Amino acid sequence: MVLGVVGISYREAALKEREAVINILKTFEADTLLAQRFFGGDGSFVLLLTCHRAEIYYFSKSNANVQSKLLSWISSLGTRPYCYQGLACFTHLFTVTSGMDSLIFGETEIQGQVKRAYIKAKTDRELPFALHFLFQKALKEGKDFRSQVSLSYPVVTMESIVEETLDLHGKSTKDKLLFIGYSDVNRKIAKGLSAKGYRNLIFCSRKNIPIPYDTVARSQLSFGKPYDVIFFGSSESARDFPGLSLESLAGIPNRVVFDFNVPRTFTLVERPEGISYLDMDFISERVQKKLQISKQCTNKEKPFLALAARKQWEVYEKKSSNISLSQIRTSRPKLLIL
């Protein structure tokens, strides 16, 4: 039996490489036969795909070569993925969920991203006990960690990077800002800009929910209208929007476009002219320049998470052992009394 993870993050790969890895990992969701070949009939997986990481957590009863196959496939894209099994897999996901492995040290969004990845996986397919236990305990320990350990608020945030960038491009609080998608990242950016005095914030979302900002319906959306800044954060590609192209975006002079989607809304061969197109690589580079993560702080908190991971790993081993024994007993043929 193998429980493990293979993946890449912003440390190992640039945005273009992460996009390629995300695309191949998504094939497991689209091709059930491929998933069975990799993980076996009793195995399964959870994909954790965010702006800064692409990971597949897997369990297989029968295929001990899963890790080497995944490593070979991802490495063929020119990347150098990391991998962990058993206790190390527990420790890694606990560290990720707590925000200790994030680009912005201690950020809280990752907790929700891990939760949504787990919910999506268990909704889409049957998960084995191992993956249920791993993710449930990671979410629990991540929450407990934040409540027990005092972390200073990140000095650098995406909101501050966006605000600074708008200033550098000569944008003002009177400009019109269009947000495509009512996603976590768009809501966070809008909230931060609203606090700084930006008032012309307009959302366009597929969701039929109350939104505390001005809205425009998808049927009425036009990129030819004078939106000074556009934020893409809906996990959709350009082909999902009729009439959307880099040329249409460039129709408004000095327009600034933030593309928070990974994979990106546009597949770029070269940087477009006429607009300032800023993707997650731009955000990551700005954050890394400004944010110097304290290794002393990181190392100080790691034993807490490592201890929690070992504790839950030992519980998992006992529970999985009991499950195996129970399965063995129930599979034995009953003796006939003659």
UniProtKB/Swiss-Prot annotation:
Biological process terms in GO annotation: protoporphyrinogen IX biosynthetic process
Biochemical pathway: Porphyrin-containing compound metabolism; protoporphyrin-IX biosynthesis; 5-aminolevulinate from L-glutamyl-tRNA(Glu): step 1/2
Catalyzed reactions: (S)-4-amino-5-oxopentanoate + tRNA(Glu) + NADP(+) = L-glutamyl-tRNA(Glu) + NADPH + H(+)
This protein's record includes keyword Cell membrane: no
Annotated binding of NADP(+), by residue: G181, Y182, S183, D184, V185, N186
Positions of the catalytic residues: C51
One Gene Ontology molecular-function label: NADP binding
Record keywords, A-Z: NADP, Oxidoreductase, Porphyrin biosynthesis
Secretion signal, residue range per the UniProt entry: none
The keyword Methyltransferase is annotated on this UniProt entry: no
Oligomer status and interactors: Homodimer.
Domain notes: Possesses an unusual extended V-shaped dimeric structure with each monomer consisting of three distinct domains arranged along a curved 'spinal' alpha-helix. The N-terminal catalytic domain specifically recognizes the glutamate moiety of the substrate. The second domain is the NADPH-binding domain, and the third C-terminal domain is responsible for dimerization.
Extra facts: During catalysis, the active site Cys acts as a nucleophile attacking the alpha-carbonyl group of tRNA-bound glutamate with the formation of a thioester intermediate between enzyme and glutamate, and the concomitant release of tRNA(Glu). The thioester intermediate is finally reduced by direct hydride transfer from NADPH, to form the product GSA.
Function of the protein: Catalyzes the NADPH-dependent reduction of glutamyl-tRNA(Glu) to glutamate 1-semialdehyde (GSA).
NCBIfam families (alphabetical): PRK00676.1
Protein name: Glutamyl-tRNA reductase
Organism encoding this protein: Chlamydia felis (strain Fe/C-56) (Chlamydophila felis)
